[in-house]
Amino acid sequence: MEAALDLFAAHGVTGTSLQMIADHMGVTKAAVYHQFHTKEDIVLAVIGPALETLTKVADAADRQRAHRRRLESALNGIVDLIIKNRRLTAIVQFDPMVAELVRAHPSRTSIERIRGMFTGADPDASALVSAAMVSGGLVMAGIDPALDGLSDEELRRHLFDTAWRLLKPRTASLSASGGRVAQPTGRV
């Protein structure tokens, strides 16, 4: 799958032929066809693990009782996913064929659940804009070559902290006992 990902990243899905994948892998086109019947099958094999992770992120966040904890959990999971899949993130976000496959994939409901965690219940315009900016910003930061010099942990911390400032729950910042609630710093 790395061979296909390399080619998708360089040429886009539409610009990558099965013959190119076969050549890159050092096998025949027939061997690729034997394993995968269509290019869509290859794309789904490449993006499938990340989509499964999205579902796990949404499920883990849903298990949290408080909205703030759900938001932290979802944001940590998304940041980790982006850092681990930088090349894939760009393909999923910007390739029209991949975007179409993602829209039709069962994990789409998980994406919507995470978006709901980012916006909160009954979101106003500010919450919707914040969620859109965070979603797009996380993707762009994950593929920005200017950030290649940052370690994964440093990038993780900055992505989480910056996104948190935009998404912070719009609930009171005092706990039920009257004390201040500590702001998260990137890991739960």
Can you say where each PLM-predicted feature lies in the sequence?
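Solvent-exposed, amphipathic alpha-helical segments
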Residues: A3, L7-A10, T53-A60, G137-A141
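Hydrophobic alpha-helical connector segments
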Residues: D41, A45, K56-A90
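Short amphipathic alpha-helical/adjacent loop interface patches that line ligand
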Residues: F36, L51, L75
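Helix-turn-helix
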Residues: A3, L7-D41, A45
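Hydrophobic/aromatic-rich alpha-helical bundle segments in the mid-to-C-terminal region
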Residues: R69, T89-A90, F94, E100-V188
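Short alpha-helical functional segments enriched in proximate histidine and acidic residues
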Residues: L7, L81, L166
